[in-house]
Amino acid sequence: ESGGPHRALGNLYMELPFFLGGSGDQSVYHLEEAVRLSPDYAENHLGLAQAYYAQNNFVSARKSLLTLLRLTDNVAEDEDLLNFRTQGQELMKKLTHD
């Protein structure tokens, strides 16, 4: 179990405009559930960090990003994990400027 359904719903709520049903709160809820169900799945932490960042919850975003970076510390051969790590590093840079 990777928390996939909750991750998908969380990403959907984050990407949809409000008038089409988008909701930052619903996004965070589903991504928190994905992390709860699969705390060692890096993509869940990236999505949750992005949702927190979108809500200006920078402390929680940083916490999720630190977990993501820890989970992807030695992943030189896995392209997906390298991509998640790179996205996380880019978001962390934004956090240091906000």
Label every PLM stretch briefly:
Residues 2-5, 44, 78:
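TPR alpha-solenoid repeat register
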Residues 11-21, 54-56, 76, 93:
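Short coil/turn linking the two alpha-helices of tandem helical-hairpin repeats
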